[in-house]
């Protein structure tokens, strides 16, 4: 059927990506995990969750990476951001839903808004940390050879800080996934809605299956991003 062909095609594409980035073991787990999700009938919900996670992560990275770079190069910015990031990381996840609902109502948009804010701190912190850990003698040598600030950033600091930055990206993706599941409480949809339905309607089996799908998706995203980080480090 067309539905089966589409699902099989999506599984195949993700299997190739996983094989290339993370190796045979992760690739096999990816294809088996996605086929299990499809077999449980949660394919559409999984794709909704994945789309929300990826879109939220991209926006969080667009905002977080420049903040991390700025924080690494400005003590004043670092002093301002440090307590803000501490507050963001200690605040309970459910609290982020309140301003999201207040400004955007119910649905996917407030879910994405809450996810972006919740998932941003790791990439800001680890980008700043990675750049600060670049050896000072390397920075000074680059400057002595006439490197401009932009050349120093993009050709020296960011490449050397990339393993740490990739760890931040990995954590941002996983925090996005955890928040997307919680955001089902404000009608964000996806796998979180299945888990929430299982809890509220006492359908233990349904909630357990939804939880398994979330875990599979989390492991796939974690291993692929870790594989990408190792590949960059090897280069």
Can you describe what each PLM-predicted range is?
Residues 122-171, 195:
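Short cytoplasmic-facing helical segments at TM-TM junctions of multi-pass membrane proteins
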Residues 1-8, 12:
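Single conserved hydrophobic/aromatic residue that forms the stacking wall/gate
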Residues 102, 131, 176-214, 233-235:
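Glycine-rich helix-loop "coupling/hinge" segments at transmembrane-helix boundaries
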Residues 44-60, 93-126, 160-166, 206-211:
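Loop-to-helix entry region at the N-terminal start of transmembrane alpha-helices
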Residues 30, 38-100, 126-129:
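Cytoplasmic-entry segments and transmembrane alpha-helices of multi-pass inner-membrane transporters
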Residues 113, 117, 149-183, 205, ...:
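Transmembrane alpha-helices
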Residues 7, 225-235:
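Transmembrane alpha-helical segments of polytopic membrane transport and secretion proteins
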Residues 10-17, 30-36, 95-99, 159:
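Hydrophobic, membrane-inserted alpha-helices
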